[in-house]
Amino acid sequence: LWGGEALLGRPGCWVRRASLRTFRLPGGEKAGREPWRSAAALHWECGLEWAALPDTDGLARAAWDSGLNCPVTSAAGRLFDAAAAIICEFPNASFEAQGPMMLESVCRSAVDGMELPLRESDDEIFRTDWQPLLGMLADHAIERVRRAELFHASIARAIAEQAKALSAQNDIAQIGLCGGVFQNRVLADQAVALLEDAGFSVYLPLALPCNDAALSYGQAAEIAARETQQ
């Protein structure tokens, strides 16, 4: 399951060039309403245990160990779910993105984000490693507001670092941001500010939603672009 991607190119001609580190997601689509699954998966992926895990019967862990119904994902939304479950102690949601919305509402000010490792893999895709965030997210010695602010700032910084890495190879001047996570104004505002400071022209959706509601429009535009190029 893709997500958190950076695509290079133009309509009808895109190449996937950057992403987030992947992890196995126990329960697949269930994770959208059960953020604890994403939080647990991040810990397990790093060989750690999560003290607040609500999976008392061990079924989710057993499924994760065996790979049963555990699709591999790099979805940024699931990363936000995990952060909400850990910081806000919010294991279950009434609707998708409820946890990230709560996490956004906790933030009070912009801070300097953590630097996350960014490496180019053998398949020529830059991958941002979220693992350094885990210790901070679960550190109760840091007040909840500060942790929420650090998380948002770190993801915004990671977006900017991906853009700079790709621009160094491809001379990029324009960046378009889309996807449900950019409904989060804290993330969007910080990402735009960092990208503009780095010299990019940045675009956010205005006429259409930036989330899945505009997927069909984007698919139609992509098909039209490809047909025009033929």
Task: State the predicted function of each range.
Residues 41, 49-54, 59-64, 68-173, ...:
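A contiguous, well-structured pocket-lining segment that forms one wall/lid of small-molecule binding clefts
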Residues 173-175, 185, 191-215:
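Conserved phosphate-binding/catalytic loops in two-lobed NTP-binding clefts
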Residues 1-20, 29, 33, 37, ...:
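Flexible glycine/proline-rich, aromatic-decorated loop/lid segments
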Residues 9-16, 46-49, 90, 166-173, ...:
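Secondary-structure transition/capping motifs at alpha-helix termini
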Residues 35-44, 153, 203-230:
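Glycine-rich phosphate-binding/hydrolytic loop that grips phosphoryl groups
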Residues 7-10, 85, 223:
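Short beta-strand-to-turn element immediately C-terminal to the catalytic PLP-Schiff-base lysine
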Residues 15-31, 64-68, 200-206:
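Short beta-alpha connecting loops at secondary-structure transitions
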Residues 10, 24, 151, 155, ...:
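Active-site proximal loops enriched in glycine and acidic residues that flank catalytic Cys/His/Asp
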